[in-house]
């Protein structure tokens, strides 16, 4: 066997986080789905909608 064919198996915990790529969660409620990560906000879309005006975002129609 060559070095590239080694049988090292990653830990199941590490493998699951790498598989989904989901490393962040909402800073307010902890939800892991529907995250707004732009500008490193890391809020779920529901929390972002509730507090976005207070953060200085404006809603355009």
From Swiss-Prot:
Comment on bound cofactor: Binds 1 zinc ion per subunit.
GO CC, one annotated term: cytosolic small ribosomal subunit
Residues involved in Zn(2+) binding: 26, 29, 44, 47
Segments of this protein annotated with the region Disordered: 1-25
Biased composition (Acidic residues): 1-12
Keywords: Metal-binding, Ribonucleoprotein, Ribosomal protein, RNA-binding, rRNA-binding, Zinc
GO molecular function: rRNA binding; structural constituent of ribosome; zinc ion binding
Disulfide bonds: none
Alphabetical GO biological process terms: cytoplasmic translation
Family per record: Belongs to the universal ribosomal protein uS14 family. Zinc-binding uS14 subfamily.
Quaternary structure note: Part of the 30S ribosomal subunit.
Role according to the record: Binds 16S rRNA, required for the assembly of 30S particles.
Name of this protein: Small ribosomal subunit protein uS14
Gene label: rps14
